[in-house]
């Protein structure tokens, strides 16, 4: 338990400004759309925020664990330090941390069903599933160039649209447009990180779009995402 707590503190310093903000903004947008249509509710809104935060922490733990196992967290890595690679936590403790955050996210998701209905069960299950498939398994999606697509889905359509749906039980064109824009903006953060890490990713076998198509194309994709979202 102590090791998990130490990991939470360490990862909080590393990730809180980036990934947790990225988890909060789409939910805020969904809440704003619901409020504009006169359907905002504080309790489901807070549950949506909590679910998003727990899923993001869970994804951070999962990525930290499996990237370490795959050898992606090299000594020459330029990005934020990772808990497993730095020896802040044992692999067994990280497994327990993943299990704990997954369980807590499922509990919060179950509470959300009282407001959304059973139709949100597949969405919650997909959130859990793809949190693992991103870096785990025989075909880790982040290692095969699918990261950008997943960001647009799980930082756009899912948090924006589902937050709105939980309160309004509806889906509008405004929600669709806002979801796409939000997902593309947050994907620029992934694109920047992949551009920064392109040499290390190539050595580690992580074939992001920047690695596959080159640095020049990566810069153009970043520009396209920003302009299209605007």
Model-derived regions: residue spans:
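Membrane-embedded alpha-helical segments that form the functional core of polytopic membrane enzymes
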Residues: 37-62, 121-132, 172-192
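Hydrophobic alpha-helical transmembrane segments
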Residues: 20-24, 42-50, 95-99, 121-125, ...
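Alpha-helical transmembrane segments of multipass membrane proteins
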Residues: 26, 51, 55, 59, ...
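Small-residue-rich segments of transmembrane alpha-helices in multi-pass membrane proteins
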Residues: 24-30, 149-164, 182, 211-215
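Short, small-residue-biased leader/transition segments that mark boundaries at the very start
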Residues: 1-14
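Solvent-exposed interhelical
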Residues: 62-102, 186-226
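Alpha-helical membrane-inserting segments
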Residues: 29, 33, 58-63, 108-112, ...
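Intramembrane alpha-helical segments
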Residues: 82-170
């Amino acid at each position: 338990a102590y090791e998990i707590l130490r990991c939470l503190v360490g990862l909080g310093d590393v990730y809180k400004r980036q990934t947790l903000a990225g988890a909060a903004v789409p939910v805020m947008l969904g809440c704003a759309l619901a409020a504009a249509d006169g359907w905002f509710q504080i309790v489901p809104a807070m549950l949506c925020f909590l679910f998003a935060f727990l899923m993001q922490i869970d994804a951070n733990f999962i990525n930290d664990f499996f990237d370490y196992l795959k050898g992606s967290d090299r000594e020459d890595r330029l990005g934020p330090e990772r808990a497993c690679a730095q020896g802040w936590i044992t692999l067994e403790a990280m497994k327990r941390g993943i299990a704990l955050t997954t369980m807590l996210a499922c509990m919060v998701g179950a509470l959300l069903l009282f407001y959304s209905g059973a139709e949100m069960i597949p969405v919650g299950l997909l959130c859990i599933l793809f949190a693992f498939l991103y870096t785990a398994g025989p075909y880790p999606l982040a290692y095969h160039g699918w990261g950008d697509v997943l960001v647009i889905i799980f930082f756009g359509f899912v948090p924006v649209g589902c937050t709105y749906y939980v309160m309004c039980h509806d889906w509008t064109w405004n929600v669709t447009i806002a979801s796409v824009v939000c997902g593309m903006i947050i994907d620029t953060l992934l694109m920047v990180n992949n551009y920064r890490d392109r040499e290390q990713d190539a050595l580690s076998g992580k074939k992001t779009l920047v690695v596959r198509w080159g640095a020049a194309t990566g810069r153009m994709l970043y520009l396209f995402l920003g302009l299209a979202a605007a």
